[in-house]
Structure formats: structure tokens, C-alpha cells
Amino acid sequence: MARSLKKGPFVADHLLKKIEYLNARREKQVITTWSRGSTIVPIMIGHTIAVYNGREHLPIFVTDQMVGHKLGEFSPTRTFRGHVKSDKKSRR
């Protein structure tokens, strides 16, 4: 179910404060966060946010097409190594 419009999008408070601080000083630096559930809002455009995927922080440069999506959508947590080409045991 979608989030109520009267509540607005969820953005972690600490992340929002960091971005507002950098926008006020007109600085660009990588912002490290564990908040994968935060929604990308228009004030984040142009910033690089390093999102934790369970093992490392993946840097994500936020563009205008990402607005409305969650930060976790852009840092995959699982690595797919492919299927085994000749696996005769699974055929039986």
C-alpha cells in the first residue's frame, strides 16, 4: 500500500539535515547513510549519497529522474553469479 499524501515522503532526519547544511554552504561531498528506506526528494539532486548494501557503501549520484524512488533501489544487496552451465545432477 502506498504512503498517505498528507504524511509526505519519508526521509531520515539526519540525512535531510546533512543535505540542507551542504546546500546552504554550496558544498558537494559524499554523504554516507544506512537509510535505504529514505525517499529521494528534489533537494538531493546533484549530491552523491553512499548507500549501505550490507557489505559496503555504494556511491549514488542523484539525478532528477530518481526523485520519488527510494535510496535502496539503487544499491543492490545480492550478487547474482549466474547459473551453472553444465549441471548434470539437477537434471535427474
Curated annotation (Swiss-Prot):
Q: Cellular component terms, GO, for this chain's entry?
A: chloroplast; mitochondrial small ribosomal subunit
Cellular location of this protein?
A: Plastid, Chloroplast
Q: Which Gene3D superfamilies does the record cross-reference, listed alphabetically?
A: 30s Ribosomal Protein S19, Chain A
Q: Which InterPro entries match?
A: Ribosomal_uS19 (IPR002222), Ribosomal_uS19_bac-type (IPR005732), Ribosomal_uS19_CS (IPR020934), Ribosomal_uS19_SF (IPR023575)
List GO molecular-function terms, semicolon-separated. rRNA binding; structural constituent of ribosome
Q: Is Cell membrane one of the keywords UniProt gives this record?
A: no
Q: Which UniProt keywords apply?
A: Chloroplast, Plastid, Ribonucleoprotein, Ribosomal protein, RNA-binding, rRNA-binding
Q: Which terms does the UniProt entry file under GO BP?
A: ribosomal small subunit assembly; translation
For the keyword rRNA-binding, the answer is: yes
Q: Which family does it belong to?
A: Belongs to the universal ribosomal protein uS19 family.
Function statement:
Protein S19 forms a complex with S13 that binds strongly to the 16S ribosomal RNA.
Q: What is the protein name given in its UniProt record?
A: Small ribosomal subunit protein uS19c
This protein's gene is called rps19
